[in-house]
């Protein structure tokens, strides 16, 4: 073959995966045979013959030591302080082989030494080893250790583990050895996986009682993260009465009294704003229950007169994702309002067979029973209900021959309703929610029988209403909920379009309503509530066809604001419309 016929050599680069390993293995042999070693490292009573180049290439610590102009760079013998010889041997073996022997007995010393010598790979390997060893009995110790050595990756991992396994962790001996600040940091977390807030209170008290003499002075600080409005008052009082130490019992009684007074007598300050937004809301990872209360049910294709008011109550478990039945209301009712205060569920007003109620019932999740409490001053259905500053507000609604325009306030401690103001625009079957100490009223039906677009805000402190930009669509029988500093108006009904599946969101930053993803099913008279950063919509009624009465729905949809999508989850046991919903 002539030279001209030879194929032109391609300009390709090839690499060998084994090259680096072979070089490293050969350097380790040279170290073992003490060939070309150019420095001795004195660690304790041991001396190690090594190569400056290998160590400097493996660690910024040694690179600075040998090339940074330090006096050690020219010495034949360099002393390494702060490391035990056996641990240094393991680290030196890693530098020359890429392999390190990690065990339960040496991992803590190893990670400290590796961190000092800036051997990041060994630090990461030790962290991975410790993560694999973690359990509810040792996680507190690992948390404290990672905090001590400022290992942020391990600290974050152990914190998350403590949050997820809190119910097991807080019963262990290590938990009682936490410092005050460490305990408070844990108890403040939104990520605690708990059944209810009472477990956080018990964990805090358990820590205090372990060394009451020294820890008594920290009672206020340690209990500050506890969300007292979520605790059933009778259960809390019963615990306090059982405290044997007189001084501690008095301190707890005083603390509880002061807290209740602050919640009941709010001032326009940041502290009360904080109370509203954080203390009343269940923790993000707490086990939560959705209570679907009352309403009416009607089969698809049935007559208008076939609707039946419900007394049944269902509970949805956010952990198991199942619906179960709980104790029924004493009085079947639809068009009612539902609220949660002090760990209790309240069912307010409503109607059955054109009889409008002023009665209020209260459900205790501990005793699993409904009891009757004080009645409103005016019977009303299609009312708006929300909780603000530890009290229940009942707004507007239908009171018989006309729309009620009064606002009533219920004090759970005094078991008393009082009229505190009036609606700026009389309305019924509207949406209502609370956000940052203000009450918002959206849509509904007016005195003239028209579906409304209007949107207003009420300040319970000044007792004044202010108008806000109206919705794009007229909506009555809608669902309303606050989520991520926005207010959502969901579904509903108007005479022109019948049941709606569209959803609007009001952005306070942009001061306008925008449409977001529509529900999969048109709904009017549904219930809406926010849980763990998601929006849950349950029940309602569908559109009517051929003049037939619309059937009630048992389906449930969940809205994710980040993906702007709706997902269907498990259906309720009973289809229902114009009921109430609460989260506990």
Swiss-Prot record:
Q: Per the record, a Pfam family?
A: BTB
Keyword Hydrolase appears in the UniProt entry: no
Q: Which residues form the BTB domain?
A: 37-104
Its organism's taxonomic lineage begins at: Eukaryota, Metazoa, Chordata, Craniata, Vertebrata
Give the record's GO CC terms. cytoplasm; cytoskeleton
InterPro entries under this entry?
BACK (IPR011705), BTB-kelch_protein (IPR017096), BTB/POZ_dom (IPR000210), BTB_POZ_IPP (IPR030104), IPP_BACK (IPR047067), Kelch-typ_b-propeller (IPR015915), Kelch_1 (IPR006652), SKP1/BTB/POZ_sf (IPR011333)
From the Swiss-Prot or TrEMBL record, give the protein name: Actin-binding protein IPP
UniProt lists the gene as Ipp
Chain positions of Kelch repeats: 296-343, 344-390, 391-437, 439-485, 487-533, 535-583
Tissue specificity is: Expression seems confined to tissues derived from trophectoderm and primitive endoderm.
Q: Which PROSITE patterns match?
A: BTB
Which UniProt keywords are listed? Answer: Actin-binding, Cytoplasm, Cytoskeleton, Kelch repeat, Repeat
Q: Tell me, in a sentence or two, what this protein's role is.
A: May play a role in organizing the actin cytoskeleton.
Cellular compartments annotated:
Cytoplasm, Cytoskeleton
One example of the protein's molecular function in GO is:
actin binding
Originating organism: Mus musculus (Mouse)
Predominant localisation class: cytoplasm
Highest taxon of source:
Eukaryota
């Amino acid at each position: 073959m002539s030279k001209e016929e030879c194929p032109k050599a391609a300009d390709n680069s090839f690499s060998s995966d084994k090259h680096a390993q072979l070089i490293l293995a050969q350097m380790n042999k040279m170290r073992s045979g003490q060939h070309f070693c150019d420095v001795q490292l004195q660690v304790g009573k041991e001396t190690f013959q090594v190569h400056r180049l290998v160590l400097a290439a493996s660690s910024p610590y040694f690179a600075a030591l040998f090339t940074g102009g330090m006096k050690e760079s020219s010495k034949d013998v360099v002393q390494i302080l702060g490391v035990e010889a056996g641990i240094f041997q393991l680290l030196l073996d890693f530098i020359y082989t890429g392999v390190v022997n990690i065990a339960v007995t040496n991992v803590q010393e190893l990670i400290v030494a590796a961190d000092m010598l800036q051997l990041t790979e060994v630090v990461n390997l030790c962290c991975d080893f410790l993560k694999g060893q973690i359990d509810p009995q040792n996680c507190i110790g690992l948390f404290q250790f990672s905090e001590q050595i400022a290992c942020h990756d391990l600290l974050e991992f152990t914190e998350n583990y403590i949050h997820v396994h809190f119910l097991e962790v807080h019963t262990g001996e290590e938990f009682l050895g936490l410092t005050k600040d460490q305990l408070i940091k844990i108890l403040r977390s939104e990520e605690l996986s708990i059944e209810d807030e009472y477990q956080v209170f018990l964990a805090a008290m358990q820590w205090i009682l372990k060394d009451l003499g020294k820890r008594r002075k920290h009672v206020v600080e340690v209990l500050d993260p506890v969300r007292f409005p979520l605790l059933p008052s009778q259960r809390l009082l019963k615990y306090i009465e059982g405290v044997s130490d007189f001084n501690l019992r008095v301190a707890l009684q005083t603390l509880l009294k002061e807290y209740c007074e602050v919640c009941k007598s709010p001032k326009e300050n940041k502290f009360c704003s904080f109370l509203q937004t954080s203390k009343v809301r269940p923790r993000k990872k707490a086990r939560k229950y959705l209570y679907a209360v009352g309403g009416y049910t009607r089969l698809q294709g049935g007559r208008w007169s076939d609707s039946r008011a419900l007394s049944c109550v269902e509970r949805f478990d956010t952990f198991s994702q199942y619906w179960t039945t709980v104790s029924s209301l004493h009085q079947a009712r639809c068009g009612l309002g539902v609220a949660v205060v002090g760990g209790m569920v309240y069912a307010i007003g409503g109607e059955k067979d054109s009889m409008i109620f002023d009665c209020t019932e209260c459900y205790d999740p501990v005793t699993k029973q409904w009891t009757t409490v004080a009645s409103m001053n005016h019977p009303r259905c299609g009312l708006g209900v929300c909780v603000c500053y530890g009290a229940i507000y009942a707004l507007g609604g239908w009171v018989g021959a006309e729309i009620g325009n009064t606002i009533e306030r219920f004090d759970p401690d005094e078991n008393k309703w009082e009229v505190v103001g009036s609606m700026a625009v009389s309305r019924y079957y509207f949406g209502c929610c609370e956000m940052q100490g203000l009450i918002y009223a959206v849509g509904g039906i007016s005195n003239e029988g028209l579906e409304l677009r209007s949107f207003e805000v009420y300040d319970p402190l000044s007792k004044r209403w202010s108008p806000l930009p109206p919705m794009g669509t007229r909506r009555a029988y809608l669902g309303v909920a606050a989520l991520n500093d926005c207010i959502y108006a969901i579904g509903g009904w108007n005479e022109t379009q019948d049941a709606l599946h569209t959803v609007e969101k009001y952005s306070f930053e942009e001061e306008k309503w925008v449409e977001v993803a529509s529900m999969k099913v048109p709904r009017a008279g549904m219930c809406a509530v926010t849980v763990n950063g998601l929006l849950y919509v349950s029940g309602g009624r569908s559109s009517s066809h051929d003049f037939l009465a619309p059937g009630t729905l048992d389906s449930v949809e969940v809205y994710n604001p980040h993906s702007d999508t709706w997902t269907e989850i498990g259906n309720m046991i009973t289809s229902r419309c114009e009921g109430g919903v609460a989260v506990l």
